[in-house]
């Protein structure tokens, strides 16, 4: 009997998926109760990846998506065929750092618990955005509380959510809220999911395990204006969908780019300075739209 179905969505992720799976099986502490499903979103080297995965990890179920419908749509394919009552969503650039699954599954013994998350560590050794505050908060308060929450490992499930790079959720509950919104191609899925889960299950609980850590290679990506526009498109879509005024949040982000750019200038980091200048330009485009 499977207790946990782990879904990993790939898209040209050959550099990451093998090390990701290596860490999954290295720290798998639930044995055959783990089901792993890799869904591929039409990678250019899919066949080579499929052959290697089938050879090295014959127990992994590999599914080729019919098209690249984005992060949410691809994960939904895996969730629908998952056989376990609990589903884990994991990015291919995630690495487990310790035995993880058994402890997180214990949280679901409480029937009110519908999702669990863990502490995200970046390749720099710093903590990632493990905890994010609700979009419904005033933007300044949201930033301040997020800093406090990250420093203190304090998680309030009524006003916060955790990073989507790796989290567990009850499949039945996720199905009832419609799974991932497939209108979101990539980014901003987490706030939308957590808003819908809380609305559907007002008495639910969400567990955060700061003592369980995983590595996320998010800080190793180079800045991409195209990807940043996709991110802001997702953000504004979620704001509008849930009737939240997104403009104050964008204004605060503009001021943050000034602060971070000044810090980069003082460190004589021209590349970082140019990145924040480009981010500010893109944010202004969204404010004018």
Where do the protein language model's features map onto the residues?
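Non-catalytic, C-terminal membrane-associated alpha-helical segments of glycosyltransferases
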Residues: 226-236, 240, 244-289
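Acidic donor-binding segment of Leloir-type glycosyltransferases
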Residues: 21-67
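Short, flexible, basic/aromatic active-site loop/helix in glycosyltransferases
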Residues: 136-159
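Conserved donor NDP-sugar-binding/catalytic core segment of glycosyltransferases
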Residues: 97-130
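A short, conserved alpha-helix in the catalytic core of glycosyltransferases
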Residues: 154, 160-179, 183-213
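A conserved hydrophobic helix/loop-capping motif in glycosyltransferases and polysaccharide synthases
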Residues: 4-16, 20, 27, 39
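Short aromatic/hydrophobic "clamp" motif used to bind/position activated sugar donors
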Residues: 87
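Glycine-rich, basic loop-to-helix element that forms the pyrophosphate-binding segment
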Residues: 64-82
